[in-house]
Design a protein with these regions (language model features):
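Basic, amphipathic "hinge/linker" alpha-helix immediately C-terminal to the N-terminal HTH DNA-binding motif
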Residues: 75-97
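Long, low-complexity, charged/polar intrinsically disordered regions in eukaryotic proteins
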Residues: 1-3
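Amphipathic alpha-helical dimerization/coiled-coil segments
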Residues: 89-124
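Basic amphipathic alpha-helical segments that dock to polyanions
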Residues: 52-59
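Beta-hairpin "wing" of winged helix-turn-helix
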Residues: 62-77, 85
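N-terminal helix-turn-helix DNA-binding core of bacterial DNA-binding proteins
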Residues: 7-51
Length: 124
């Protein structure tokens, strides 16, 4: 995929970006993705099942994620679950989205819209 292909997918929707972030550390099933998004956003984003799976299907169609062949041990697994993984192209797009957002945040700091440090530790 070319830089042009990556750029054509930006900006990502917040849900699509969160799904990609949830898969950076490894494969997850849909419910696991949902819970990771809720945890990481400290409950600020609680995706419903329908929109989550529609977004996942769109990301699969775009080649950003794929259904994973890896599964947990049978005693820990439910065969009905679909596991997803981030593709190399999906990682490229996620990185490009982070760079795009970092630039915008930098502009906000330059314009003194915000001052000081921004914490992601969970304290508001």
């Amino acid at each position: 995929m070319t830089d042009q292909d990556v750029a054509s997918l930006l900006p990502l929707t917040p849900l699509s970006f969160q799904i990609l972030l949830a898969l950076v550390d490894g494969e997850r099933h849909g419910y696991g993705i949902m819970k990771e998004i809720e945890r990481r956003t400290r409950g600020r984003m609680t995706p419903a099942t329908g929109p989550l799976y529609l977004a996942a299907q769109r990301l699969m169609d775009q080649g950003l994620i794929a259904e994973s062949e890896k599964r947990p041990a049978p005693e820990l697994d439910d065969q009905r679950r679909r596991y997803y993984e981030l593709t190399p192209f999906g990682r490229q797009v996620a990185v490009a989205e982070v760079e795009r957002m970092a630039y915008l945040v930098g502009v906000a700091f330059e314009k003194k819209l915000v001052e000081g440090d921004i914490s992601i530790s969970g304290s508001d």
